Amino acid sequence: MTARASATTATTAAKPASAPSEAAQTDGQTDGHTKAQAEADALLHRLDAAKNSWATTTAAERVALLRAVKVAIMPVAEDWAATASQKKQIPAGSPLEGEEWLSGPYALLSACNNFIATLEAMDGRSLAATLPRRRLRNGQTAVSVVPHTLWDRLLLSGIRAEVWMQPGLDSTAIDERSAQAYATPASEREGRVALVLGAGNIAAIPLLDTLQKLLVENQVVLLKLNPVNDYLLPFFEAAFKPLIDQDFLAVIPGDAALGAWACEHDLVAEIHVTGAGSTHDAIVWGTGARRATAQGRDAPEQPPDYLRARRCLPHYRRAGAMERRRHPISG
């Protein structure tokens, strides 16, 4: 890296006239952002045109698409895991390569299998009735979700996971409220366009977030990758080709500026964030001095109608009563 930096410096010193000016660099960046925005805008319009078509697909049609996604994953899975290992400087043949398989192709395949099993087994909305439950000391109901299959028991030995219900929700209410996205007849559903701002730590997280929006919430998705995962774009596009081909999903790379632009797009009805609190705050409150001013006035800058946040949810709640008044969080 030092040698490369020295060579660059030497070249610049030898040909000062050819070095781009600050204005030229800015213009180049602006042109790049403008092109990226134009491409993203075109994709958002295609998603918007297809949103109701997706919302009205039946469970059987979604199962067929998920099976097609599984088939599409297989030819790229090995290169996907190998490329991720190389980027993280994991030696070829190292046991650590297994982590890239588990947090990449396997995670997506497993999610597809679980959604397929759920959609095929769902009778109305009664699937939750088959899951083990227990009552906590405080009276809340906990539903066991992992392990659920034989593969869970083999690969996740000793790991258990439960969903703890809100206080006051008994078993009857749980059965009635499960699979809400499928409660409305397919012909009566209305679609929405969701922006998923992909996390950067685990490659599979944005993929699973995307399936959440598509299959659980009936929303088509523009997935913007975290820049650290831009190199995985070809693999994600190949794996999700059955959904991308029908304009139910689009995947784009891009920096924070493109993400900020997409957050303000008129066609984006919902934003899904999995990441740092700083990302959340930049979306809701703005940046720099504007953030301090907006937070001081308890008035966010042009907030989206809905913001779904995971790890940054506590930051959202600290804003005060404002979010209950203007920014309902579903789920």
Model-derived features with residue positions:
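ALDH superfamily catalytic-core signature
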Residues: 16, 29, 227, 237-248, ...
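Conserved C-terminal structural/oligomerization subdomain of aldehyde/semialdehyde dehydrogenase
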Residues: 2-3, 27, 50-66, 187-190, ...
